[in-house]
């Protein structure tokens, strides 16, 4: 058998290929890191006072002041709300959403958020866009009292179209072992309180985007339900972070037995996660003041009330199950932190469903 002579492989270009020519700009990444360092410093708290740039983030648990701590961890993303941020070219609030989705899941277990890490993946890194995103993450961390101790920025040409990106967040908190939630003494007659949401928060945006498409409106159009704002601005209203008011109420009273973060799946999927067998949450739908954005979505998309309740928060972003004799005390503690609290219903016996409704939702 004869071997065909082939010319040796030659590098493309006089000096060969570079990583930048392959689509990864290390210099842009380094520039972004330098720009975000002041943002990261603004989130420092007891236990975390280091700089980013090392191989791992450090946290001194002893400095946080816990006696018998249990660590609680959560991770989450922002979902297709990011597509609105990308299409509307507004990136400074989705970082708040990212933090909120993680730390709200910590506080429902009675945990104080300690530190946060983010993952930012994009097809083509824009340092200015990245700084806007991290500015939102830092703001969310400040609202939660959590330190931003590290993260990863991944520029991946070919994985994402230029301009597209995705975010993931990772949060770790701690609770004293004897203050973990939910408690085991939830009982018939316990009162259900609701804390107001700021709007759609970070769930249901595939349906939101479909409804907007059917409406014929664009992200720069005036929001029909929020005068003075564009549709993109209104729908990008960041998710509320409930950490500080809830921790204040937990510390001020022993009345809170359980908390539920109302995210994807709405009331019927999230409330039963914290309830014992044999008990259901009876919710008076007429007690909910439904924000205008949900009425617009329901009417424009022809979405039925039950579908709204299993997709969106419908105006209630957090649920608390409270001892009846401690309701006034808990409400006062929450109100002192600026929370709008509504009495939604009570715990009742059940055979099957974990949530039962009274009345109708005012859409």
Curated annotation (Swiss-Prot):
Pathway: Purine metabolism; IMP biosynthesis via de novo pathway; 5-amino-1-(5-phospho-D-ribosyl)imidazole from N(2)-formyl-N(1)-(5-phospho-D-ribosyl)glycinamide: step 2/2. Keywords: ATP-binding, Cytoplasm, Ligase, Nucleotide-binding, Purine biosynthesis. Disulfide bonds: none annotated. The keyword Cytoplasm applies. Belongs to the AIR synthase family. It comes from Brucella anthropi (strain ATCC 49188 / DSM 6882 / CCUG 24695 / JCM 21032 / LMG 3331 / NBRC 15819 / NCTC 12168 / Alc 37) (Ochrobactrum anthropi). One of its GO terms (biological process) is adenine biosynthetic process. One of its GO terms (cellular component) is cytosol. InterPro entries: PurM-like_C_dom, PurM-like_C_sf, PurM-like_N, PurM-like_N_sf, PurM_cligase. The lineage of its organism: Bacteria, Pseudomonadati, Pseudomonadota, Alphaproteobacteria, Hyphomicrobiales. This is Phosphoribosylformylglycinamidine cyclo-ligase. The keyword Transferase does not apply. It is found in: Cytoplasm. Its EC number is 6.3.3.1. GO terms for molecular function: ATP binding; phosphoribosylamine-glycine ligase activity; phosphoribosylformylglycinamidine cyclo-ligase activity. The gene is purM. It catalyses: 2-formamido-N(1)-(5-O-phospho-beta-D-ribosyl)acetamidine + ATP = 5-amino-1-(5-phospho-beta-D-ribosyl)imidazole + ADP + phosphate + H(+).
